[in-house]
Regions:
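Polybasic low-complexity intrinsically disordered regions
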Residues: 1-74, 79, 87-89
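Residue-level preference for alpha-helix termini and adjacent loops
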Residues: 9, 16-17, 24-26, 30, ...
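Short acidic (Asp/Glu) and glycine-rich catalytic loops that position anionic groups and cofactors
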Residues: 35-42, 69-70, 105-114, 136-142
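Generic, well-ordered alpha-helical scaffold segments in large soluble proteins
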Residues: 36, 60-67, 93, 131-134, ...
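Residues immediately flanking
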Residues: 37, 79, 102, 163-165
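Composition- and surface-driven signal marking solvent-exposed, interaction-prone regions
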Residues: 45-47, 87-92, 146-150, 172-174
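An internal, acidic/charged active-site-proximal segment
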Residues: 68-123
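Basic, amphipathic alpha-helical segments enriched in Lys/Arg and hydrophobic/aromatic residues
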Residues: 116-174
């Protein structure tokens, strides 16, 4: 029986089985987050099922291009998104530097213009992970107590708004 057809919760029938390499199986929904250099969460997508991260890189990039009207100059992504099949189309869409945390056989020179840029983007991505940790722990992004898929999505978006408002409040005026 395919995972999408399995009922894993009587109370939350929309819950999915989330399997990530070497970790314990989780039940819920996979999220894809996009953040900017300020730390603001710019976009969140609640995925149906458990799609591979690599399959979601280009659709998430396309969402940002559609929203901004232009591609980002640089992007940094988790190792799960790394593949040549993602690198070449991202470059073709106008992204100058694409840094994946895991290289997966891709040369740094193919991803970015220099080793220095790669290190900067890799370190930036580590900061994103810290922001995601704060989002999960301080704003409820790890566990939703609202029932139903639509309520889950509303809960996540309300957590994003709370997270972003706190970042705005912490900004110092010039």
């Amino acid at each position: 029986m395919p995972a999408g057809e399995k009922l894993v919760s009587l109370f939350e029938p929309h819950a999915d089985i989330i399997v990530k390499g070497g970790r314990a199986v989780q039940y819920g929904h996979k999220l894809n987050l996009v953040t900017g250099k300020s730390g603001l969460i710019l976009d969140v997508v609640v995925e149906a099922g458990n799609p591979a991260d690599a399959e979601r890189f280009l659709p998430m990039l396309d969402r940002q291009i559609a929203r901004r009207g232009a591609p980002p100059r640089q992007t940094a992504a988790d190792g799960g998104y790394a593949s040549r099949d993602n690198l070449k189309p991202a470059k073709a869409r106008g992204v100058q530097d694409v840094a994946f945390h895991k290289k997966c056989g891709i040369a740094v020179a193919d991803m970015v213009k220099s080793q220095w840029v790669y290190r900067r983007l890799r370190n930036f991505r580590a900061g994103i992970e810290a922001g995601i940790s704060v989002f999960k722990r301080a704003y409820g992004g790890a566990r939703c107590i609202w029932r139903g898929l639509d309520h889950f999505k509303a809960y996540i978006w309300s957590a994003v708004v709370a997270h972003n408002l706190m970042l705005f409040a912490r900004l110092k005026s010039p």
